[in-house]
A protein has these predicted regions:
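Auxiliary Fe-S-binding modules of radical SAM enzymes
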Residues: 1-39, 70-74, 104-115, 137-138, ...
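Conserved functional loop/turn residues at catalytic and ligand-binding sites
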Residues: 46, 50, 55, 80, ...
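Nucleotide phosphate-binding site architecture
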Residues: 27, 48, 151
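A secondary-structure boundary/capping signal
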Residues: 22, 42-43, 87, 121, ...
Length: 278
């Protein structure tokens, strides 16, 4: 691991910050951190949901730390990150408070590190329209909300989520931001394969996302975090990942990242470049 990796880890500990890179056991942590791309996870390290694929623990979260956005921005500035990805656990106990934390961290990063692009990966806020509107109005460079899986598997894989609600989130974010003088925000989503879905179901999800004008799609392999999590149904071949990428590109996505180790934030800066943001 390089110097940037160790500096980021040390700073996160000093500032009492979490990274999804560590909490979700991401396989790309060394590569991303050494290339000055990191994903900070706000609003605690306990999630109010228990998704079947996710390594982040479920529990009763602490009250929202209103100083956290400033500390995240400080870390971004100190590390000289060119592309910062900010996500959070689900906070079904306080959706508007969670949305406000995203608004605040976007503003703080722009104040403390004005050269950094901001990508936010948000929950669905249980479909609360005002929460979504708050984040859209803050104008992150990229607004990401992960669809995660096919509709049939939501009950076992994405407990607490609803497929149609996630589609609506992405569609409304694009529609609402289009009225701004700067034009629509770049929207992004990700899906995990290998949880029991069929190929035709994946292509159906891609069509639903393309119909809602999503710009960036990431496709990665599910890797079971523990025996307590959803079993992996199978490992997709390189040819299958290439096929999925080709099919998605044909549907009109501006950028598709597809491969076994692809995660939401993998090559995030390069994805921004491909859409003309950098």
């Amino acid at each position: 691991m390089g110097e940037t990796f160790h500096n980021l880890k040390k700073l996160a500990r000093e500032l009492n910050l979490h990274t999804v890179c560590e909490s979700a056991h991401c396989p790309n942590i060394g590569e991303c951190w050494n290339h000055k791309t990191a994903t900070f996870m706000m609003l605690g390290n306990l999630c109010t949901r228990r998704c079947g694929f996710c390594a982040v623990p479920k529990g009763k979260p602490e009250p929202i730390d209103h100083e956290e956005p400033s500390r995240v921005a400080y870390a971004v500035a100190q590390l000289g990150l060119k592309h910062a990805v900010i996500t959070s656990v689900n906070r079904d106990d306080n959706n508007l408070g969670a949305a406000q934390a995203f608004v605040n961290v976007i503003a703080e990063i722009r104040r403390q590190s004005p050269g950094t692009q901001v990508e936010v990966l948000t929950p669905d806020f249980q479909g609360v329209p005002e929460a979504r509107r708050m984040v859209v109005a803050a104008r992150p460079e990229i607004l990401n909300h992960n669809i995660e899986t096919v509709p049939r598997l939501y009950r076992v894989a994405k407990s607490g989520g609803r497929y149609e609600r996630s589609l609506e989130f992405l569609a409304e974010a694009k529609r609402e931001s289009s009225a701004h003088e700067l034009g629509p925000i770049v929207t992004k989503t990700g899906i995990i394969v290998g949880m029991g879905e069929e190929m035709h179901e994946l292509l159906g999800v891609f069509r639903d996302l393309a119909d809602r004008k999503v710009d960036i799609l990431t496709i990665g392999q599910y890797l079971r975090p523990s025996r307590d999590h959803l079993p992996m149904s199978r490992f997709y071949t390189p040819d299958e990942f290439a096929f999925l990428k080709h099919e998605a590109q044909q549907m009109g996505f501006r950028h598709v990242e597809s491969g076994p180790l692809v995660r939401s934030s993998y090559h995030a800066h390069e994805q921004a470049q491909s859409t003309g943001l950098a």
